[in-house]
């Protein structure tokens, strides 16, 4: 899996970790501008450690554990520069991007995964009859 091929659920979790870190930084230092951090997030060793120690990321995107802080910065910058379809680039923040991937993930669940689970459950139920 290359860096640009992370699924929406993986991107969403990384963005959530990143957002939590930005909020924490602003709470510690009132001089920081949260609006600026949402467009140009601080990605440091703490963010990297949180990503690398996350069990979900370990299972679903093991390559995250091999990323450096610099690679993670590049990755997030890439996602921000890709933006969101039909949304002006200047309106893209880590929150709007997370919302986009959240919505995308919900659609994936509704359109692909839930029908598959229902079908498999029905097959199992039919076998038990």
Swiss-Prot record:
GO biological process, one term: chromatin remodeling
Pfam family, one: SWC7
Principal subcellular localisation of the protein: nucleus
Domain of life according to the entry: Eukaryota
Entry keywords, A to Z: Activator, Chromatin regulator, Nucleus, Transcription, Transcription regulation
Protein purpose: Component of the SWR1 complex which mediates the ATP-dependent exchange of histone H2A for the H2A variant HZT1 leading to transcriptional regulation of selected genes by chromatin remodeling.
Complexes and interactors: Component of the SWR1 chromatin remodeling complex.
Disulfide bonds: none
Subcellular location: Nucleus
Segments crossing the lipid bilayer: none
Record flagged with keyword S-adenosyl-L-methionine: no
Family: Belongs to the SWC7 family.
Protein name, per record: SWR1-complex protein 7
Protein's organism: Candida glabrata (strain ATCC 2001 / BCRC 20586 / JCM 3761 / NBRC 0622 / NRRL Y-65 / CBS 138) (Yeast)
Gene Ontology CC terms: Swr1 complex
């Amino acid at each position: 899996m290359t860096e640009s091929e992370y699924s929406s659920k993986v991107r969403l979790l990384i963005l959530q970790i990143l957002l939590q870190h930005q909020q924490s930084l602003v709470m510690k230092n009132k001089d920081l501008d949260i609006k600026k951090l949402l467009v140009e997030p601080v990605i440091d060793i703490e963010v990297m450690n949180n990503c690398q120690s996350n069990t979900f990321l370990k299972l679903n995107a093991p390559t995250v554990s091999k990323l450096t802080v610099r690679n993670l910065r590049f990755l997030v910058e890439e996602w921000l520069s890709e933006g969101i379809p039909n949304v002006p680039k200047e309106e893209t923040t880590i929150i709007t991007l997370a919302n986009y991937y959240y919505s995308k993930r919900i659609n994936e669940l509704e359109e692909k995964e839930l029908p598959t689970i229902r079908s498999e459950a029905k097959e199992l139920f039919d076998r038990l009859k």
